[in-house]
């Protein structure tokens, strides 16, 4: 699994000109699911996301987590994060999981985050053409890959 976490002042996702979800201060998470991904990847990511300290404390130091600030999370599926660009200039999606694998993992990821946060997370709609708006805060952007845990 690959994610991009963006610290935001607010974010929203719109589908067919209708707002599906919106959040205030928190994280916009773009989620790409690969063919080899499992529930173990979800568990690792959720622990990292919940514990990640990228919000400022009283001294202006990034020392507070999403839980500490009582922030919100919006998760948007994005298979393009699994792009392979090894050959040529047109990306390939051979590493992206098929729908029958990725939809249950996407739903489980969102449920696990909600459970860890103790409140619902906002979501997009898997496979839909979505318009995502956000106001980056910082900007602070973190990329994580469960196959390359650095």
Model-derived features: where do they sit?
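A charged helix-plus-loop insertion that forms the helical arch/lid used to bind
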Residues: 87-101
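N-terminal, polar/charged subdomain of small-to-medium soluble alpha/beta proteins
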Residues: 1-89, 104-150
């Amino acid at each position: 699994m690959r994610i991009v976490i963006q610290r935001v002042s607010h974010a929203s996702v719109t589908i067919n000109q209708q707002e599906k979800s919106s959040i205030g201060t928190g994280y916009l998470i773009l989620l790409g699911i690969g063919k080899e991904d499992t529930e173990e990847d979800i568990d690792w990511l959720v622990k990292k996301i919940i514990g990640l300290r990228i919000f400022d404390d009283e001294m202006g130091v990034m020392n507070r987590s999403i839980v500490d600030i009582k922030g919100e999370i919006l998760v948007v599926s994005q298979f393009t994060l699994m792009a392979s660009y090894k050959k040529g200039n047109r990306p390939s999606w051979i590493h992206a999981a098929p729908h029958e694998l990725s939809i249950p993992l996407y739903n489980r990821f969102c449920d696990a985050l909600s459970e860890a946060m103790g409140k619902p997370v906002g979501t997009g709609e898997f496979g839909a053409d979505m318009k995502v708006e956000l106001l980056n805060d910082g900007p602070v952007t973190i990329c994580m890959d469960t196959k390359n845990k650095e």
